Design a protein with these regions (language model features):
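Short beta-strand element of the alpha/beta-hydrolase
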Residues: 17-28, 96
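Gly/Ala-rich beta-loop-alpha elbow adjacent to hydrolase catalytic centers
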Residues: 98-107, 128
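Conserved alpha/beta-hydrolase "acid-adjacent" motif
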Residues: 307-313
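Accessory cap/linker subdomain of secreted extracellular hydrolases
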Residues: 121, 131-288
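Short glycine-enriched nucleophile-adjacent loop
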Residues: 104-119
Length: 411
């Protein structure tokens, strides 16, 4: 244990390459039981000579602050832990940080200038691989709120306050007004079609696999079950403060301009509390910021149909990095899949290999344009880095979705 956080470390017995890969796991719920999670890349890492390490973090919930601090602490403790276990090792020649979902937020935040300056445990990383990450930090929660507000508005049950105290009571009526089934998102009503158009634009614009993602009932249910919550992110922020802000959001859907303008003028706008997520003197923020201030190679992966951490997170990340002059350190890749983090191990392994080569040789790998609307709308968008090859370490969900004929082909 490091404090109250458990950890797991594996080092190849005979062929360690002198390099360490540190894994940041995703959201593990709001219970008290902590657990270390193995990365799906475990076999790849060990077979290729990498040591790997992962923390349980000292807290669950959406506690990215704990994730950053505990992951950094484990990275710094690697050599001492190895020595205590009878295997003294040289300091790693390279240290890579990678993670999924909330772990993608942790990965991207840990390499930011702000977190590097304020963290209690100042670990250095040579390259980072955030996958399906919350790369726009609190903008994800703005998106969830905007989605809910749009649904209520289109259902004729508009919100007048946030959070809406009546949400649980009216949620069934909202669903009925927008979808032809209470158990499926695949067949929207006329108003539901407008909602689908709004969500498409909120999540990144017209692109392949969005239709399959919007119709992904399991993931949509997770999103809708989160509607009605306060903006304190399940108590992560103190004093009932809220980071949610929808003032800048423009809702776009297929209708005459006057109709769209009226919709935008009448929908409830949420204003964040100004000091909800301040800088702290005892470590990183409760919800660490991703400002685009990083100076190491970063390669990202994101699925096109993700409704839980949508593709627009990649767009926000690039815009922030560009504003800080750091876009040259960033490569982004789109994957044609309809769920959250449902990459094949082959896709992850290729990304890690390319990142390591970039760090060690200076040769920057290729990636996708994540901003140009006409590029995203092309039928083959996302084909370049999608690899439907599955193996023993892939999840059942990934194997099901990547089966031939399940998704639009890249031919």
């Amino acid at each position: 244990m490091i404090g109250t956080a458990a950890y797991r470390i594996e080092v190849p017995k005979t062929h360690w390459n002198g390099k360490l890969a540190v894994y940041a796991h995703g959201y593990a719920g709001d219970g008290n039981k902590l657990a270390v999670q193995n990365p799906l890349l475990r076999r790849y890492l060990l077979d290729n000579g990498y040591a790997w390490a992962a923390s349980s973090y000292s807290k669950n919930f959406y506690d990215v602050q704990a994730g950053v601090e505990d992951t950094n602490a484990l990275t710094l403790a690697f050599n001492n832990i190895a020595a205590r276990n009878g295997r003294p090792l040289a300091v790693p020649t390279r240290t890579y940080l990678f993670g999924i979902s909330m772990g993608g937020h942790i990965t991207a935040a840990a390499i930011e200038a702000e977190a590097q300056a304020t963290t209690r445990s100042k670990a250095h990383y040579d390259g980072a691989l955030p996958m399906c990450g919350v790369l726009g930090d609190t903008e994800l929660f703005d998106h969830f709120a905007a989605y809910q507000l749009a649904a209520q508005q289109l259902a004729g049950l508009p919100a007048s306050t946030f959070p809406d105290p009546n949400w649980r009571a009216i949620a069934p009526d909202v669903r009925t007004a927008l979808f032809n089934s209470t158990t499926s998102f695949a067949t929207p009503t006329a108003q539901g079609a407008r909602l689908k158009s709004i969500v498409m634009n909120l999540t990144g614009g017209a692109r392949p696999i969005f239709d399959e993602g919007f119709a992904n009932d399991g993931l949509q249910k997770v999103v809708w079950d989160g509607f009605g919550r306060t903006g304190d992110i399940n108590g992560i922020l103190v004093n009932n403060t809220s980071v949610v802000d929808t003032r800048r959001i423009r809702y776009r859907f297929d209708a005459p301009d006057a109709v769209v303008d009226t919709f935008n003028a009448s929908i409830k706008r949420i204003v964040a509390d100004t000091n909800a997520n301040p800088l702290r003197s005892d470590g990183v923020r409760w919800i660490p910021k991703i400002n685009g201030e990083f100076n190491i190679p970063v390669l990202t992966l994101h699925t096109l149909g993700d409704m839980y951490v949508p593709y627009m997170m990649e767009q926000v990340y690039l815009q922030r990095a560009t504003a800080k002059g750091n876009a040259g350190h960033l490569v982004q890749r789109a994957i044609r899949a309809p769920g959250h983090c449902d990459f094949t191990v082959a896709e992850q392994a290729t990304a890690f290999t390319d990142l390591a080569k970039w760090v060690e040789t200076g040769t920057k790998p290729a990636g996708d344009d994540v901003l140009t609307a006409s590029v995203l709308a092309q039928p083959r968008y996302g084909c370049s880095y999608t690899d439907n090859t599955v193996g023993v370490d892939d999840t059942a969900t990934v194997k099901t979705w990547r089966a031939k004929g399940k998704l639009p082909a890249c031919n």
